[in-house]
Regions:
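General structural feature for long, well-ordered alpha-helical segments within catalytic domains
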Residues: 15, 19-22, 26-29, 40-43, ...
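Glycine-rich phosphate-binding loops that contact phosphosugars or nucleotide phosphates
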Residues: 53-197
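Single conserved hydrophobic/aromatic residue that forms the stacking wall/gate
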Residues: 197-206
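An N-terminal, well-structured beta->alpha segment
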Residues: 4-54
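Short, flexible loop segments at the rims of nucleotide/cofactor-binding pockets, characterized by
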Residues: 35-39, 87-89, 116-117, 204
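Generic detector of well-ordered secondary structure
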Residues: 24-25, 32, 80, 187, ...
Length: 206
């Protein structure tokens, strides 16, 4: 199979097999992500509304490494819609000093990005926030349905997990389809009122 005019032999020789495949597969995975969001939109909207229907609230996007970049990219697009209540922080900053970033009393939607859903900083971020925040909801966006974040969502009422399809759990050093799908899923999740037509017909979105 040839991808970007690279043969299997060339990709093996240059150790680029995973990276090339994961870049190439992105349009197909985006359509699957759109379909996923369309399938759970009512349940997801009800969960998010517990926060955003309040008079005042915070939406806090958190991740480490490339997962932090997802939040840094998203908050600029989301802020106008949510009256500039969206923030983006590194989970590695929140873990040691959550009180410097999170409100103790304000309703807070903590959106946690984690490719594996198992990293110490992702899990530590959840527990640190629980200690500080009195009115906290977690939205986990992960590429691993078997990860700890996903399992946590199944057992806690204040958690919701968007488990992206297995092929988005990139194996290459560079996060490509995992990054773009976590971005897309979160953008759609926080724009369900504007996206209903498009996510029910994903070819129009893409």
């Amino acid at each position: 199979m040839s991808i970007f005019n690279l043969t299997d032999e060339k990709m093996k020789e240059t150790s680029s097999t995973f990276t090339a495949h994961e870049i190439y597969q992105q349009p197909a995975t985006w359509r699957k992500t759109c379909a996923q969001l369309a399938a759970c939109k009512d349940e997801l909207q009800a969960f998010i509304d517990q926060v955003v229907k309040q008079d005042d609230f915070d939406i806090v996007l958190v991740g480490a490494g490339t997962s932090e970049f997802v939040g840094n990219s998203l908050f600029q697009a989301l802020n106008p819609k949510y009256n500039y209540k969206v923030k983006s922080y590194a989970s590695t900053d929140i873990v040691p000093s959550p009180e410097n970033f999170l409100s103790r009393t304000k309703p807070t939607l903590l959106v946690n990005f984690g490719r594996s859903g198992n990293s110490p900083e992702s899990l530590g971020n959840v527990e640190a926030a629980e200690v500080v925040c009195q009115n906290l909801y977690h939205l986990f966006v992960t590429c691993n349905h078997e990860g700890t974040l996903s399992k946590m969502a199944a057992s806690r009422k204040n958690c919701f997990a968007i488990n992206l399809t297995p092929e988005t759990h990139d194996q290459s050093f560079a996060m490509t389809s995992s990054y773009s799908n976590m971005y897309l899923a979160t953008y759609l999740a926080l724009n369900l009122d504007l996206s209903l037509i498009h996510i029910s017909e994903p070819t129009r979105l893409l």
